[in-house]
């Protein structure tokens, strides 16, 4: 939010609706991706008029016009269309979620994975936690003495079973600014504590499991890919994982990746260390690709843009490339 991603995504959503006002079909996939985030945060239909009222008031203030101006009426119509689309999509998502709202879970284990990544395992005696699709994420609702409000953040599921879920959290430090929630989780949450989570959601998942699978994860972007790699390892024609890290110390979940790789003869793992090998380039990617490989990418914005550009240059069709971002998708220029 402090980096402006949320406001950019909202503006882009309304603009996209205005440009496709007669037929929203072209933007429905993006609407669904955003809808997953909304459902994770428990956004409800009654919240949309509140957002719309404040959005239109902001436009009036910035442009210097009143509420009866044709521009405001036009944007009100565009917002109404996009709000209705979100409400429709989110109704379906809510119906498929494993539980309603935020439920309490016990933190049974905290593991330091790298100097800035921790893995949190939560358990439940009453809730079946196996109902998730590899690639999905949970949402943590947390209170901290250092925060003036309750805060919610999404974290990708690394592993899960009937009575446990494990998710990874990177301490977010960017230009001297520490992420408030990730810092609270790292510094204030201990084994035995309680965390409140909403049910797993997300559309990042395996496509065409009968085809070769290639996973490209940089930094903490490896987290959703681990459960996806685990899902296909041993069964896929080929399952290849490339984990890009700045240094050997920064490489995350390596023992788990090695364990998964050992489960099948068609699995392959490469830990790409930038301090030794430089950036991952198209020439190296080329040897991991076949004519029908499904590719999954997750990492920071620069890594994501670089990989998508390289894959396009290598002739990989857009429909075979799947990616996840840790910021609102419409705020990422890809």
Indicate where each model-derived feature is located:
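Ferredoxin-reductase
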Residues: 96-194, 244-248, 258, 274-275
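Globin-like tetrapyrrole-binding proteins
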Residues: 1-102
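A short acidic, glycine/proline-enriched capping/turn motif at secondary-structure boundaries
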Residues: 41, 172-175, 202
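Surface-exposed helix-capping loop/turn segments at secondary-structure junctions
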Residues: 65, 147, 207-208
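Short, well-ordered, mixed-charge alpha-helical segments that flank or form enzyme active sites
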Residues: 85-86, 115, 332
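FNR/FR-type flavoprotein reductase catalytic core
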Residues: 7, 51, 180-334
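Catalytic cores of large soluble enzymes that bind and process phosphate-bearing ligands
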Residues: 43, 47, 67, 177, ...
